[in-house]
A protein has these predicted regions:
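Active-site neighborhoods and metal-handling regions in enzymes and metal-associated proteins
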Residues: 1-395
Length: 395
């Protein structure tokens, strides 16, 4: 399974049409994901910038380091590949020299909003306009992209399955982290594996970090009382998905069960609105608004969701203030969360496809508290966990 050559050709044509409609003479592409989206060519930039100059009616030119020139020449929709000498370079041979030559004579130049300050300074005389042309193209997925995202979501589900199977009272964080290896092995075995565009993270935020969703657990952390948030977060051959579940390794208290139920209801209110034509801000108001009505507004930290594609976080943004409106074949997450000091965090997340008349959740791991309360002793799992801890020196 892979994106076909013809699709990359069509993507470039759509970008050229967007450049024309924006009344620009040319558009400079610099983001790694954008270049991958347009060409399908995998590379690792390190300190070396890459550029594609797209004009509406003439050839597409790519500027890359000399050592990547032949590799990049395989792009199906690039007419010319130019090269610069490795950094630092002799005068006249560096990337900035090549870039100035590339944009010479252009009066109306568009650039990506993510353009770095270093590159912006080189072309400041052109007064380039930051326009999210590629971000807009990426919002609605093709049939091949949906297939890639569906595949990525299946591996996100597998990661969550591995997390839950490895969990028991007192399990260490390193035992959960180590489950990602099995997922990556499956990706290697079953797909056209792209090592530079594949990454897998399986983790569990222990209750002590439950109110810090972007905190970082120690590999020696142990999961004991309270709600824990399992996260299976990956990119498989260029396309991203996630599955998150709140789970317990002891019987949840009544208060925990009530917060879990309210989190599920907020999700249900979001799901009920997912269909083409619905503003993303309306979905956020339904989910987070419900939690505020329940008196829990002080325990909200983030929007209801975000988009998926090449990135784990991209448009459309399911947030109050978002201008995005759902269309068929968009991908979003649904993840309203509660973060209550002294109690913990409560959040599920799914990777969701917008269909012609509603939605399809591509991640399908069970969501109910009964399936996510893990009280079995799991003697063999504990033994395997002890071997993992010993291998990495965790007591």
């Amino acid at each position: 399974m892979a994106i076909q050559k013809q699709e990359f050709i069509e993507r470039m044509k759509r970008l050229q049409a967007s450049v024309r409609l924006s009344e620009l003479e040319a558009f400079l592409v610099t983001a790694q994901d954008s270049i991958f989206y347009l060409t399908g060519v995998t590379y690792s930039p390190l300190e070396r910038p890459f550029f594609i100059l797209v004009r509406p009616d003439t050839g597409v030119v790519l500027l890359a380091p000399t050592l990547d020139r032949d590799h990049l020449a395989s792009a199906p929709n690039v007419d010319e590949v130019r090269a610069y000498w490795d950094y630092p370079s002799p005068p006249g041979l560096g990337w900035s020299d090549g870039l100035l030559e590339l944009v010479a004579g252009i009066r109306l130049l568009g650039v990506e909003p993510s353009l770095t300050q270093e590159i912006a300074q080189v072309i400041s005389a052109w007064q380039p306009q930051a326009v999210p042309l590629i971000e807009r193209l990426r919002l609605v997925k093709s049939a091949d992209e949906v297939a890639m995202l569906r595949q990525a979501a299946s591996y996100a589900d597998l990661g969550m399955q591995k997390i839950i199977q490895a969990a028991y009272y007192g399990v260490s964080e390193i035992e959960i982290f180590s489950q990602g290896r099995a997922v990556q092995i499956q990706i290697i075995k079953e797909t056209e594996f792209d090592p530079l565009n594949t990454s897998v993270l399986t983790a569990a935020w222990p209750a002590r970090l439950g109110t810090q969703p972007h905190g970082v657990p120690s590999i020696a952390d142990r999961l004991k009382d309270g709600p824990h948030i399992g996260l299976s977060f990956l990119r498989a051959n260029g396309y991203a998905a996630e599955c998150e579940r709140t789970f317990f390794v002891t019987s949840p208290s009544q208060n925990m069960s009530e917060m879990f139920t309210l989190m599920l209801e907020a999700r249900n209110r979001a799901f009920a609105l997912i269909r083409p034509g619905v503003p993303c801000a309306e979905i956020d108001r339904a989910a987070n608004g419900f939690l505020r009505q329940e008196g829990l507004g002080d325990y909200l930290l983030h929007r209801t969701g975000h988009g998926f594609g090449l990135g784990n976080h991209e448009g459309p943004w399911v947030a109050e203030g978002s201008p995005d409106v759902l269309e068929e074949n968009m991908l979003i997450s649904v993840e309203p969360g509660l973060y209550i000091p002294g109690l913990g965090g409560f959040r599920h997340s799914d990777t969701v496809l917008v269909t012609s008349d509603g939605y399809e959740s591509l991640t399908r791991y069970p969501t109910e508290i009964e399936a996510l309360t893990l009280l079995a002793r799991r003697s063999m799992t504990r033994l395997r966990g002890a071997l993992v801890r010993k291998a990495v020196g965790v007591a």
